[in-house]
């Protein structure tokens, strides 16, 4: 499967086209809108989320609530476009039009794609860069992830995410929770955290950053249960599932690190404490005593829960802007200010769930059958029986 997104932050709409989704998948706008609403929530979101009411329109690939196997097109309208129709219009603008009308930006923001993107594509107006590099694009990536989650759900794979850290405030490790329990707790937390004791402390950190014109980042974790053993491959570098998951996490705006299982902690421990001992019993087949590998070894699933974490840096748009240089005059200035969040870690966790879900669903479809859900389910059932008796 693959998808491609299109659209600008303040353009008329965002679009995603999904190719390779099997026929026979139950899919409605309601499924997708639930995920879009989750992305809009979270303590620390800015005024843009008060303007937009993200809802999806399915315009191809689905008939009467069932996928057809043909490309699926999803669109999400930008409600704020009505205030930007002249600024973001597709028609040419007369030389007489003022820079104010175009809302031209010549002062790049440190930490954003602004300067590098302007140099790469030759844009003298940085708005041409920031409109596409904006995290607003993740709206339709979450829509794509909602489709992937629906595939996973029908195949018995469940996924959940939660926030581990915000602005240096760390949640305690809470184990032995089911995916359903994680989902219930996080949906009732303003910061999507499992540790109620630090929830308010995280919110205070966000509020303090906002009041001082600053921003803060954090760490999110995604867990998926129910993946069969042996999904992915050790044969080629680009078929390793852990590599695909790490790449997916790193593709999210402002994410600067990814780890799987114990991750970087593995460098500090001896092998005897890192590697997961193999067990077998008649009921479960092969399993592991521990899950330090995060459900992945040699680029393939082990049958244990998939555990992926991502590190999000503080959002670069600051209301207390850093020093920059005007690309027209080369004079030192304070960077431009665009409407933004003070902390988007809780929302980014939803995006992380979406990209992980997509990679897992893609791997299953690729390995067990591309055309229709019925065949996919049969093949996975046969594989699970085979792996158990192996």
UniProtKB/Swiss-Prot annotation:
Reduced FMN (FMNH(2)). FMN binds at residues 132-134, 253-254, 298, 313-317, 339. Its cofactor is FMNH2. Disulfide bonds: none annotated. The keyword Secreted does not apply. It is an enzyme of class 4 (lyase). One of its GO terms (molecular function) is chorismate synthase activity. It comes from the Bacteria. Pathway: Metabolic intermediate biosynthesis; chorismate biosynthesis; chorismate from D-erythrose 4-phosphate and phosphoenolpyruvate: step 7/7. One of its GO terms (biological process) is aromatic amino acid family biosynthetic process. NADP(+) binds at residues 39, 45. One of its GO terms (cellular component) is cytosol. Its EC number is 4.2.3.5. Keywords: Amino-acid biosynthesis, Aromatic amino acid biosynthesis, FAD, Flavoprotein, FMN, Lyase, NADP. It catalyses: 5-O-(1-carboxyvinyl)-3-phosphoshikimate = chorismate + phosphate. NCBIfam families: aroC (TIGR00033), PRK05382.1 (NF003793), PRK12463.1 (NF009113). Belongs to the chorismate synthase family. Homotetramer. This reaction introduces a second double bond into the aromatic ring system. This is Chorismate synthase 2. It comes from Bacillus cereus (strain ATCC 14579 / DSM 31 / CCUG 7414 / JCM 2152 / NBRC 15305 / NCIMB 9373 / NCTC 2599 / NRRL B-3711). The gene is aroC2.
């Amino acid at each position: 499967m693959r998808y491609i997104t299109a659209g600008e932050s303040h353009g008329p709409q965002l679009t995603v086209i999904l190719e390779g989704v099997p026929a026979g998948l139950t899919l409605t706008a309601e499924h997708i809108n639930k995920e879009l609403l989750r992305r809009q929530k979270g303590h620390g979101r800015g005024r843009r989320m008060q303007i937009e009411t993200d809802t999806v329109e399915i315009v191809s690939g689905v008939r009467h609530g069932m996928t057809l196997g043909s490309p699926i097109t999803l669109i999400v309208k930008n409600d704020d476009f009505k205030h930007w129709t002249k600024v973001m219009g597709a028609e040419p603008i007369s030389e007489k039009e003022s820079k104010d009308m175009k809302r031209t930006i010549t002062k790049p923001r440190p930490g954003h794609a602004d300067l590098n993107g302007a140099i790469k594509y030759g844009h003298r107006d940085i708005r041409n860069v920031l409109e596409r590099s904006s995290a607003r694009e993740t709206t339709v990536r979450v829509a794509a992830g909602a489709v992937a989650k629906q595939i996973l759900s029908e195949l018995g794979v469940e996924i959940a995410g939660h926030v581990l850290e915000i602005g240096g405030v760390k949640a305690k490790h809470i184990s032995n929770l089911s995916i359903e329990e994680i989902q219930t707790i996080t949906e009732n937390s303003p910061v999507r955290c499992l540790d109620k004791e630090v929830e308010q402390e995280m919110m205070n950190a966000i509020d303090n950053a906002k009041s001082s014109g600053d921003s803060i980042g954090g760490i999110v974790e995604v867990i998926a249960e129910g993946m069969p053993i042996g999904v992915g491959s050790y044969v080629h570098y680009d078929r390793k599932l852990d590599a695909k998951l790490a790449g997916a996490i790193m593709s999210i705006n402002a994410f600067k690190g990814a780890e799987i299982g114990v991750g970087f902690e593995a460098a500090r421990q001896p092998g005897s404490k890192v590697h997961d001992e193999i067990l077998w019993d008649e009921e479960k087949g092969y399993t592991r005593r521990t899950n330090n590998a995060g459900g992945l070894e040699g680029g393939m699933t082990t049958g244990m829960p998939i555990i992926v974490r991502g590190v999000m840096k503080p959002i670069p748009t600051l209301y207390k802007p850093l020093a920059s240089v005007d690309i027209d005059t080369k004079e030192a200035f304070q960077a431009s200010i665009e409407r933004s969040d003070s902390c988007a870690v809780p929302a980014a966790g939803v995006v992380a769930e979406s990209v992980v879900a997509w990679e897992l669903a893609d791997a299953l479809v690729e390995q067990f059958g591309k055309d229709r859900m019925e065949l996919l389910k049969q093949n996975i059932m046969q594989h699970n029986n085979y792996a158990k008796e192996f």
